[in-house]
Regions:
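Iron-sulfur-associated redox domains of electron-transfer enzymes in respiratory
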Residues: 34-209
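Iron-sulfur cluster-binding cysteine motifs and their immediate structural context
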Residues: 1-17, 21-37
Length: 209
């Protein structure tokens, strides 16, 4: 989804599905994932109550780090609280079960991945009607947090996938920002916060099973 204009590579918006493949394959390394760390810092210093929604895959990036340690670090970094995106996934899963029991559709395509949803809508439009009408887990989690802490609270997602940035752009009233784990790591490094102490309790995480 890249074209060359005036000797410069540019993304073709109507063809882009935010998968990040162009970042990997561009021989000139001209494409970069948008960095939103400065926007996050502004949000944290704005006086707003900012809550972090953490993808469960943090355990794969922050090796050996306990959730209590990550929670404590984010609270010290300025977040009002921390919760796991899996809470939203639990809610969506329950609704999916009911949807499958009630629908006459031969297939139901998950709405969890924004890159997959965009790909279907742009390249396989005949399957678009089969995309689940339910929100993605991160959007469901944002709604849960706002219901608890108020509509004026802000939610920032941290996860492994840059495509979530498109959800933040499209549903900014629910999700203020979406950043990948390296950005979270940079934030903690800049604030000289170590992932070694537990000062604050977790706000609650999804049950195992």
């Amino acid at each position: 989804a890249i074209r060359i204009i005036g000797g410069k590579a540019s993304v073709i918006p109507e063809a882009c599905v935010s998968c990040g493949e162009c970042v990997k394959v561009c021989p000139a390394h001209a494409k970069k994932i948008r960095r939103d760390l400065a926007r996050l810092k502004d949000l944290l210093s704005s006086g707003a109550k900012v809550y972090a929604s953490i993808a469960p895959s943090f355990t794969g990036y922050f090796k050996g780090v306990k959730i209590e340690e990550l929670t404590s670090a984010l609270v010290r970094a300025g977040f009002a609280g921390v919760s796991e995106t899996a809470h939203g996934a639990e809610s969506v899963s329950a609704h999916v079960s009911r949807l499958l029991a009630q629908t006459s559709s031969p297939i139901v395509i998950s709405s969890a991945c924004p890159a997959a949803v965009d790909m279907i809508r742009k390249y396989l439009p005949k399957f678009a009607p089969f995309i689940s009408p339910l929100p993605s887990p991160v959007r469901a989690h944002c709604r849960q947090l706002k219901e608890i802490y108020g509509d004026d609270s802000k939610v920032v997602f941290f996860g492994p996938c840059a495509a979530k940035k498109t959800e933040a752009d499209t549903y900014s009233n629910e999700l203020s920002l979406a950043l990948i784990f390296p950005a979270l790591e940079r934030l903690l490094e800049e604030k000289d916060i170590k992932l070694t102490e537990t000062l604050e309790p977790s706000m609650g995480f999804a049950e195992e099973g």
